[in-house]
UniProtKB/Swiss-Prot annotation:
Pfam families: HK97-gp10_like. The gene is yqbI. InterPro entries: HK97-gp10_tail. The lineage of its organism: Bacteria, Bacillati, Bacillota, Bacilli, Bacillales. It comes from Bacillus subtilis (strain 168). This is Uncharacterized protein YqbI. To B.subtilis XkdI.
Length: 167
């Protein structure tokens, strides 16, 4: 018995399994990583999380100092920043560590207009922080939700495209 197109289909499967499809998948995944970085930056701006752009410009894909990692099935995307305060900005934080049993603390620095500039070497000026909770902006959580929806749709389209191209 001969099935028309079976040999061609088997050759296509063989070609795809030898790395052609894997390379396409890796390239697409790389581009999705950069897309995720764009979404994070958009959410930082939308939620008005920054005023100095330091946090905005600090995120990188595959950063050694990464503090955020997304894992979905076998997909793992590490997005990092070397800024210690990024998770506090996202999640929220107390102005004073509750375990220190204090109701206020002094932060050295200086005021420049309506912005405070932290300077640990400043001896003559600063600001007094009272104990309170500061809400986080949720920029990471928002970006993750947006990315997951976008990722699913993009993967469906890419799978259809790859099936069409390979078979």
């Amino acid at each position: 018995m001969k099935i028309r197109g079976l040999d061609q289909f088997i050759q296509s499967l063989d070609r795809a399994s030898r790395g052609g499809l894997k390379r396409k998948y890796e390239q697409w995944l790389e581009s999705m990583g950069f897309e995720f970085l764009d979404i994070i930056q958009d959410e930082i701006i939308r939620t008005k999380t920054v005023d100095t752009r330091r946090l905005l410009n600090s995120f990188q894909k595959g950063d050694q100092d990464n503090i955020f990692s997304m894992t979905e099935g076998s997909l793992k995307l590490d997005v990092g920043t070397n800024l210690d305060y990024a998770s506090y900005v996202n999640d929220g934080h107390f102005t004073i560590d509750p375990s220190k049993n204090q109701d206020r603390r002094w932060v050295p620095g200086r005021w420049k207009g309506d912005r405070f500039e932290y300077d640990p070497a400043e001896k003559n000026s600063g600001m007094l922080l009272k104990f309170r909770w500061v809400d986080g902006s949720g920029f990471w959580d928002n970006a993750m939700a947006i990315f997951q929806l976008m990722f699913e749709r993009s993967l469906e389209r890419k799978l259809q495209q790859w099936i069409y191209e390979e078979f």
